[in-house]
Design a protein with these regions (language model features):
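N-terminal auxiliary interaction/assembly segments of multi-subunit proteins
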Residues: 1-321
Length: 321
């Protein structure tokens, strides 16, 4: 069994190296080294063991964890930082844990798919690379991908490092830094108005409360994360609602409004979003005027009904999510 697992790891490592070298056009630094027998519980000081991606295979378990320094670097990058956060002697925050859980879940899904696929097929590098590219980490994924894979069987550990250099593509330094998901898509929110409430007031909102929202000058605001990209006006294309771009911002950081009322959302590849220009139509994937979705601190938290108070647009909260 140890030989079978070793063969699997070597095939997986080879496919990763081949695929990612082609995808990023850079040499992947990959090192496989032996590690003495260490119980998982003894690794807690140096790695992020919870959450972690666990892949169950026949006779062995693959536990995907992040070394502490790399964990802070990856989480800082995913949360909008520069990825240079130093190791800190503090627990990971709830937000960091949630981001790490999502990251690990996607990786675990990919590895599980490969394991199931490879259980009845030859694990040759070309086939592994082909399947790996179709399992959630497609070629062209532009992000810093730093991970440590710990593979255990019968109390023996083998540690594989996969450390990919920063992509030479400029997305990590561009306007959409960290705004895209694992598939390279950006969720754009089309706001019909935002409130002047501060964060503390927004957290106290409940059912029945009315939030007055002021529409931005010129139309609707199209936003990706904290970045405002353009003002738009709504219209229709067939049976779909669309936003027509009136003018374009250069991804200026406007901050996240405490409360924003949405006309709808659209998920688009980040390259397409970067190319949006005046006069373009952005067809919305989801539109809903009744009830109106309310974003609180950048997250969908409530739904409400549009009302008018003294000629001002407002939303009465009907449901908390």
């Amino acid at each position: 069994m140890q030989t079978a697992v070793s063969d699997f790891i070597n095939a997986f490592a080879s496919s990763c190296s081949d695929l990612l070298t082609r995808a990023l056009r850079k040499r992947v630094v990959l090192q496989v080294e032996e590690m003495s027998s260490v119980p998982a519980s003894d690794l807690s000081d140096t790695v992020l063991t919870a959450p972690a991606a666990v892949v169950k295979g026949p006779g062995c378990t693959i536990a995907v964890v992040l070394e502490r320094q790399l964990a802070f670097s990856v989480l800082d990058t995913l949360l909008g930082g520069d990825g240079k956060t130093a190791v800190e002697n503090r627990p990971f925050s709830d937000v960091e844990q949630a981001v790490a859980a999502s990251f690990m879940e996607k990786l675990a899904d990919c590895l599980n798919s490969i394991w199931r696929w490879g259980s009845d097929k030859d694990l040759v590098p070309d086939k592994m690379a082909e399947y790996f590219s179709e399992s959630g980490f497609s070629a062209g994924k532009e992000m810093v991908f730093l991970a440590v894979l710990n593979v255990s069987w019968d109390k023996n550990w083998r540690k594989m490092y996969i450390c990919i250099p920063d992509s030479d593509l400029d997305v990590l330094e561009g306007e959409l830094k960290n705004a895209f998901d694992a598939d390279g898509n950006v969720t754009l929110s089309v706001e019909m108005g935002s409130s002047s409430l501060d964060a503390g007031e927004a957290r106290q909102l409940g059912i029945g409360d009315v939030v007055c929202v002021a529409p931005p000058e010129g139309g609707l605001m199209v936003r990706a994360g904290k970045k405002a990209f353009c003002l738009a006006q709504s219209g229709a294309v067939g049976d779909s609602v669309a936003a027509s771009i009136l003018c374009r911002y250069e991804g200026q950081d406007t901050g996240t409004p405490a409360v924003a009322a949405l006309l709808g959302t659209a998920k688009r590849p980040w390259k397409e979003v970067l190319n949006l220009d005046t006069g373009d139509l952005l067809v919305l994937d989801r539109t809903r005027m009744s009830p109106v979705p309310l974003m609180v601190a950048g997250q969908l938290k409530a739904e409400g009904q549009v009302i008018v108070i003294d000629k001002r647009l407002g939303v009465r909260i009907k449901k908390l999510l």
